[in-house]
């Protein structure tokens, strides 16, 4: 948004909760010249102020309640199916924050089925962080009849949302496709993120909930052996580099309830090795790494 505004010679405004957005993301809006305001509240508090702002000032809203944004996000599903030769996977798994992506992907799937581009619908499942799980609780506790806003708390900042704007749309998608909703812990997110990185892809923490959620859906028998699954990664690795560095350094969970259990993640940690400027030391480190990974 800020980049397009800069190219179009328009003013842009970004409201974010103070101290709760990674600097990797914040750097983009700053560099593109947006008026970036850090409010002393959470994400949902920012949304409340933004909703009031558009009533009083000629401001065009570009968050996930904007229907044009949903239409744009639909293209992810269209490209996905095109690349698969219009043969749908059995499952598509999406991170759940404000629920715009899941709503958009679901809308695209339903429209492609109506246009007979695909013969059947994949099951679309939504994964939330345990500390930011209002949609999960809505489905599990109330059958989707209502949602209870909460104070969200997760290191996966992109889905740290306690009152998702698109929950009703996401619920319709869940019901139409026969998908599931699941929640994952902070440690499960960190482990899944490291596994995705080790595969040469990389993503921000919020995206890694999809792999962590897939593991739970497999354990429950919802995803069966031999079924095809597509995990949607919505954010680049460099959007939250601090998380990655702290994880591999081994202090991501220091002082948290996960500190003791985080020892199980050590095999996934790849901290930099400090050596003398000596060829022999480098060769020894290389050979040790080869033995470890063989």
Question: How would you label these PLM feature ranges?
Answer:
Residues 10-46:
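A glycine-rich helix N-cap at a beta->alpha junction
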Residues 56, 84-88, 223-224:
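Glycine-rich phosphate-binding loop signature in dinucleotide/nucleotide-binding domains
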Residues 59-60, 90, 124, 227:
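Conserved acidic residues
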């Amino acid at each position: 948004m800020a980049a397009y505004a800069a190219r179009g010679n328009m003013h842009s405004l970004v409201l974010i909760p103070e101290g709760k957005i990674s600097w990797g993301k914040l750097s983009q809006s700053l560099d593109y010249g947006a008026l970036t305001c850090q409010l002393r509240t959470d994400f949902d508090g920012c949304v409340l102020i933004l909703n009031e702002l558009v009533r009083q000032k000629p401001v065009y809203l570009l968050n996930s309640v904007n229907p044009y944004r949903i239409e744009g996000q639909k293209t992810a599903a269209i490209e996905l199916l095109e690349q698969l030769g219009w043969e749908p996977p059995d499952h598509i798994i999406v991170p759940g924050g404000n629920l715009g992506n899941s709503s958009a992907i679901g809308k695209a799937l339903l429209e492609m089925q109506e246009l007979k581009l695909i013969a059947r619908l994949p099951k679309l499942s939504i994964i939330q962080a345990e500390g930011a799980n209002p949609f999960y609780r809505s489905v599990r506790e109330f059958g989707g009849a209502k949602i209870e806003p909460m104070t969200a708390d997760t290191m996966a900042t992109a889905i740290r949302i306690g009152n998702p704007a698109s929950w009703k749309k996401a619920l319709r998608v869940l019901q139409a496709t026969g998908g599931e909703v699941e929640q994952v812990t902070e440690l499960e997110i960190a482990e899944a993120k490291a596994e995705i990185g080790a595969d040469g892809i990389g993503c921000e923490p919020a995206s890694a909930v999809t792999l962590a959620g897939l593991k739970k859906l497999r354990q429950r028998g919802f995803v069966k052996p031999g079924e095809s699954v597509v995990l949607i990664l919505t954010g680049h690795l460099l959007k939250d580099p601090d998380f990655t560095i702290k994880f591999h350094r081994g202090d991501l969970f220091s002082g948290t309830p996960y500190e003791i259990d985080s020892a199980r993640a050590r095999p996934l940690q790849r901290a930099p090795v400090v050596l003398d400027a000596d060829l022999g030391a480098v060769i020894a480190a290389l050979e040790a790494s080869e033995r470890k990974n063989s």
